[in-house]
């Protein structure tokens, strides 16, 4: 095509307001150019950041992302999403599976590319991309002990404390993180005091962290370190401790998980375990695209270590 002809075509396109029909173009290529990211909700900061990082990682590979939630409003859950996946609008799914979803191995035996992210097991049926929560929690506990804490409280348990069951846990953020704390304490010849475990059920919000920490304070059982199982809980714990007159970190150290955006900007900047979303999102995208193009055929578990992001809530 000559430059003159190209200029004429571009003028006509502009005058007519023509836009490329991406869906139609991709049908001709035997793929849609889209992947689906399914999360329980976009309210938790961790999941919102997962979505943003997944979109960016996909964009770098010339893919777009449909983001959908399956645990809000009239949504019917992850199982329904898996059952009714539409391959004409998306080439595959990255699924962040909630701890409360009733999912079986059979549910994950699907006929489209699927990658699971997060702390739920896939029973070896599907690709699984997740940081090592057990190792991260052990690191967090060790970090507090090495800086002078001797009695640790944990904020964010889901169920009644059962050390034997927790040591066998293979899924669930709360269970795996508690397992890591217990393992690290036992390596040091210590036991976690059941009276210092704050149960928040499924509520991992700032308010829950504050309420449960206040209950621990009111119990009168002494503690000088708090492991909050996410940063929202940790922010609540910091609020309760300061309201009760405790000096952080001089009297009580606090560490969270996920390195949320607000963590560095609190009145007492929060020490936290890195969420490793910088690794999780691009790894999941690379994995799903490998499934789509056929270069990856066997399910794998892909994990990585987390590091302490040290700030003023610890010594």
What are the residue ranges of the model-derived segments?
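N-terminal helix-turn-helix DNA-binding module of bacterial transcription factors
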Residues: 1-31, 315
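Glycine-rich phosphate-binding loop signature in dinucleotide/nucleotide-binding domains
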Residues: 16, 87-89, 147-148, 216-222
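Alpha-helical recognition/docking segments in bacterial nutrient-uptake
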Residues: 22, 30-142, 146
């Amino acid at each position: 095509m000559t430059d003159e002809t190209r200029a004429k075509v571009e003028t006509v396109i502009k005058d007519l307001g023509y836009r490329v029909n991406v869906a139609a173009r991709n049908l001709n290529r035997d793929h849609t150019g889209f992947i689906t990211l399914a999360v329980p909700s976009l309210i938790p900061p961790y999941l919102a950041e997962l979505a943003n990082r997944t979109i960016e990682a996909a964009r770098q590979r010339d893919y777009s992302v449909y983001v959908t939630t399956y645990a809000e409003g009239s949504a019917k859950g992850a199982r329904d999403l898996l059952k009714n996946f539409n391959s004409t609008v998306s080439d595959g799914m990255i699924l962040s599976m909630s701890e409360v979803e009733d999912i079986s191995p059979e549910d994950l035996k699907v006929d489209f590319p699927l990658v699971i992210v997060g702390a739920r097991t896939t029973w070896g049926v599907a690709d699984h991309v997740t940081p090592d929560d057990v190792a991260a929690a052990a690191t967090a506990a060790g970090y507090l002990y090495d800086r002078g804490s001797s009695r640790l409280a944990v904020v964010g348990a889901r169920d009644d404390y059962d050390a034997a069951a927790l040591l066998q846990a293979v899924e669930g953020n709360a269970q795996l993180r508690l397992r890591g704390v217990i393992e690290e304490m036992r390596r040091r010849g210590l036991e976690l005091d059941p009276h210092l475990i704050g149960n928040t059920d499924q509520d991992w919000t700032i308010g829950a962290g504050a309420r449960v920490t206040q209950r621990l304070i009111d119990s009168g059982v002494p503690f000088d370190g708090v492991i909050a199982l996410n940063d929202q809980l940790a922010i609540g714990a910091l609020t309760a401790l300061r309201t009760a007159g405790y000096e952080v970190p001089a009297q009580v150290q606090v560490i969270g998980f996920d390195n949320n955006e607000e963590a560095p900007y609190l009145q007492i900047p929060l020490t936290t375990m890195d969420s490793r979303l910088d690794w999780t999102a691009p790894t999941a995208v690379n994995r799903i695209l490998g499934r789509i193009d056929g270069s990856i055929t066997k399910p794998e578990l892909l994990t990585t270590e987390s590091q302490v992001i040290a700030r003023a809530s610890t010594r």
